[in-house]
């Protein structure tokens, strides 16, 4: 069994995978002060809900991280409690799958590498627009030959929520929920609707503009923690909340045989 870990700025996704299939998955907050022992305690409690000894079958781990301060704690987690050395995903892993980063600054986050590996594996002959709705919303343009030739980076929905919370004194705290209508008669409902429809309009607007500028016919793939809320966005051809995890597992299997 493989443990795939996706450390994002806001949350950390952990998945147990066997033979390429996700057996179980959890999401915890990302915290730079969480120790290896605390990680192990947390994972043990979550895993025990499925099986008391499920972690005994762990034979490898791969990590995608965009939060460097967390890396040493997660590495210690696997070395100390599982006696394995985890694979940390880097840009060099893109080469193993025939991907080329054709950007002015040819360095991207490990999560984006995993996204592109999985997307290219699933749709090998398509020109792709891969949207990751994380703390930042990243639009990746990948041609059918495996070249990442363009990108757009915009705020994620959690950034919008945080900004409203931090920059306004009287507005209530809220979570983003799917809203059927945009015009509401209460402050709380209006805030929820504004966040939902505002973010959705941003994603649809950027996607529409990318498609307008592109000379290619793009297959649009969406992933990320909040993608389920926005499954009804226009232009999205495929939604896969596990795309990053799939890419992490594929990279592990490629590097470890």
Curated annotation (Swiss-Prot):
EC code(s) of this entry: 2.7.1.33
Catalytic activity: (R)-pantothenate + ATP = (R)-4'-phosphopantothenate + ADP + H(+)
Record's subcellular location: Cytoplasm
Residues binding ATP: 6-13, 135
Annotated keywords: ATP-binding, Coenzyme A biosynthesis, Cytoplasm, Kinase, Metal-binding, Nucleotide-binding, Potassium, Transferase
Predominant place of localization: cytoplasm
Role: Catalyzes the phosphorylation of pantothenate (Pan), the first step in CoA biosynthesis.
Similarity field: Belongs to the type III pantothenate kinase family.
Oligomeric form and interacting partners: Homodimer.
Protein name: Type III pantothenate kinase
Organism annotation: Anaplasma marginale (strain St. Maries)
Protein's gene: coaX
């Amino acid at each position: 069994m493989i443990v795939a870990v996706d450390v994002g700025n806001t949350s950390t996704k952990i998945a147990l995978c066997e033979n390429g299939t996700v057996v179980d998955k959890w999401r915890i907050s990302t915290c730079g002060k969480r120790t290896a022992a605390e990680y192990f305690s947390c994972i043990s409690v979550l895993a025990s809900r499925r099986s008391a000894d499920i972690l005994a079958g762990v034979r490898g781990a791969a990590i995608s991280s965009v939060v460097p301060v967390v890396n040493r704690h997660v590495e210690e987690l696997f070395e100390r409690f599982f006696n394995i050395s985890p694979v940390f995903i880097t840009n060099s892993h893109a080469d193993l799958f025939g991907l080329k980063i054709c950007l002015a600054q040819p360095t991207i986050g490990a999560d984006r590498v995993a996204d592109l590996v999985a997307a290219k594996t699933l749709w090998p002959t398509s020109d792709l627009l891969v949207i990751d709705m994380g703390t930042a919303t990243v639009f990746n343009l990948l041609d059918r030959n495996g070249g990442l030739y363009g990108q757009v980076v915009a705020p994620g929905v959690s950034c919008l929520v945080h900004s409203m919370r931090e920059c306004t004194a009287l507005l209530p705290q809220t979570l983003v929920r799917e809203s059927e209508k945009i015009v509401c008669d209460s402050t709380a409902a209006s805030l929820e609707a504004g966040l939902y429809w505002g973010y959705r309009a941003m994603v649809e607007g950027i996607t529409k503009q990318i498609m307008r500028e592109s000379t290619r016919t793009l297959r649009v793939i969406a992933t990320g923690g909040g993608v389920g809320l926005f499954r009804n966005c226009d232009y999205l051809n495929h939604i896969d909340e596990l795309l990053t995890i799939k890419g992490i597992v594929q990279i592990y299997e490629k590097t470890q045989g």
